[in-house]
């Protein structure tokens, strides 16, 4: 077992008091009289009793941790392009700034920040995902520039005003209460600290595209041939967010908007089709995609649409940049 010498960054997720190292597999909150498990140097700082919804989310992503990149085509240029747009805000932070990624999945985004001389805390509610993220980091970076923890996004185990930036990508819609998360972000951020909310789904596909595809799949019995047939409990119940929702979340967290990016128009249809085909019928080494030059042309088209009144409402995703007042 590895000693959890990164514990200085964390507090008890319940009472927010300091933690003490008991041994290589356990840390204790004396205030709560509660021991938290440490797995391979990763503190498991979850609430004492995880609600059923969150437990099922964690179990699902434990199982899917090895398939995450394959399912979401995260190396595609259309994905990387928009990820780089919000990562730019974090790379501009001063050297030594502490960035917390919540719901970080397999660590793809967090690993891209490690060459920017930032301290990156990679977290997820899934132990399997955090372990997967840890494999993307060199031994010299572990517990120095790259810290790993298992935690609940609605009970962040960090001290008040201790974080320079918080990032959550394609995970806000997995939370039972986004408002609670935004309040937690306000608590842990330093004054003027940044929040990056990346790739959150818009509402309209849930009422137009997905019901149509579901019905079509039932008629054609397509799902019987699919490689992946299940979704997480959060994805099954998700309805996305509209612009008004995001503004209400900011208000709940007393945060100020810096930038709202509209992600994908035509690219949303393309990505949905290709990711479905690849995740159902192709292996990791056989996935198909548009040539990069074609993807760049579609991005130019999408950027043009994003400036047209009315049509700009129909982006597939949002990226929100905000700061603490």
What is the meaning of each model-derived region?
Residues 4-7, 248, 259-325:
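A C-terminal cap/extension of S-adenosyl-L-methionine-dependent methyltransferases
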Residues 8-11, 38-94, 108-112, 129-132, 194-223, ...:
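Conserved class I S-adenosyl-L-methionine
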Residues 167:
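A conserved beta-strand element that flanks and buttresses the S-adenosyl-L-methionine
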Residues 170-171:
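Short catalytic micro-motifs in class I SAM-dependent methyltransferases
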Residues 229-245:
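Acceptor-substrate binding/catalytic loop of class I
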Residues 179-191:
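A short glycine-rich, Lys/Arg-flanked "PGG" loop and its adjoining helix->strand segment in the class I
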Residues 100, 104-155:
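Class I SAM-dependent methyltransferase SAM/SAH-binding core
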